[in-house]
């Protein structure tokens, strides 16, 4: 895979499965005609939760997927082996017992890293820019997750959709799949101190925030704040601050005609060049290219 800086707005998605990769898929409808998915059984009830497709993957090298502008939230939970996923401009290692949640309309990529198979379950949503995505501002990007139940739900859904195809059974399986994603994406046990702190930060994204400021709001030490954020969000406090700023920037690029420099200042970047470089690293394209893509 080329370095991120080499990815141009004209680049295309990449799908490399290789001869040893195996997968099973359930899709919401027949609109997706890609070779690897077009023969999969259909469960229309998935669309009630805006789910496009779900599946299990046994990936082996040279397995590699690149999505330049992923059109929906994507959750991956590993149950054996390990692989790499590109999240927020950085490659993150995903091992067994770990999940990753990617928000919509950003660059996403995944690949194998060793000769051993990487086995995971995934759920891919299809969301429009005007709808509220599954991934929220307090959703973790990575974190501990027992994939057993989600894997079983996807296997059950596939078996039912391939066999009896009873609506009542499909309903229960699809509900379980969605609820297991929600359990990871919107944890009810989220630390109240973090919630209050990030609520205040989101209301003042244009100001300069330093780690001591954040720790003071949360009433914890700087080191404890780092540990809390790592545990709850899979990010450092500074990384999550950047995430919130870029989420707001994407919204402003979509709904306003403000100049990029104006938006950069509004979300807390003193330099438009720093804003542009950071935006490209996390989202996969520069702000001006991102805005242009919204018009197509």
Where are these regions (language model features)?
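N-terminal regulatory/effector-sensing and dimerization cores
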Residues: 1, 43-139
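Short helix-to-turn junction characteristic of helix-turn-helix DNA-binding domains
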Residues: 78, 201-205, 253
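Short hydrophobic/aromatic patch on the recognition helix
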Residues: 97, 225, 229, 274-275, ...
